[in-house]
Amino acid sequence: STPKPSSAASDVYKRQMINNFNINQVGEYKREGIVHRLDRVTSGIMICPIDSEAFHQLQKDFKSRKIKKKYKAITEGTLKSKTGEINLPLIHSQNNRRKREISKNGREAITKYNTISKTNSFSLLDIDLITGRNHQIRAHFEYLKAPIVNDVLYGAKKVNDLDENTICLQSYDIEFKLFDKDYKFSIDEPDYFSLIMNM
């Protein structure tokens, strides 16, 4: 696994990883790569297997929701409930094709959250991503009127101390089983999370 910085597109980051990887370490070159995506503005862990069998197995496991993905996020304001489950289907927005929006005719999208801490202005959340739709977390919390901090596309205010391509959303923990072996990868929160929560 490898941490992707926010502002790096998954495809671009994949090419960079391949260019930086010494294939002599593993012998014959094989076409593998990233088995899942993160939004361009989201930071965090990405799985990049170099073995063909592992690559295809992990692809299947992502589709069948066997891989546990956890995120941390900071939202504007506070939520009505400290913990909750958001079960709201998503479609492409009719007004902005870059966005997703809630629709009863959309694809199933389930997000669970728990509030870790909060201030008068912000909430730090631990999020379980049950389904993995594009922009799922961002659209769900916009709907709850608690957008991800600095996520201007989804209704948040611009934070002067953050780059426009950085939002307060991080994939920080992934767990999965592969060929009867358990794997768990975790990373620390980025420094700007503390900056926001101390504002």
Where are these regions (language model features)?
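RNA pseudouridine synthases
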Residues: S6-M199
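Short, exposed "boundary/linker" segments that immediately precede the start
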Residues: S1-P3
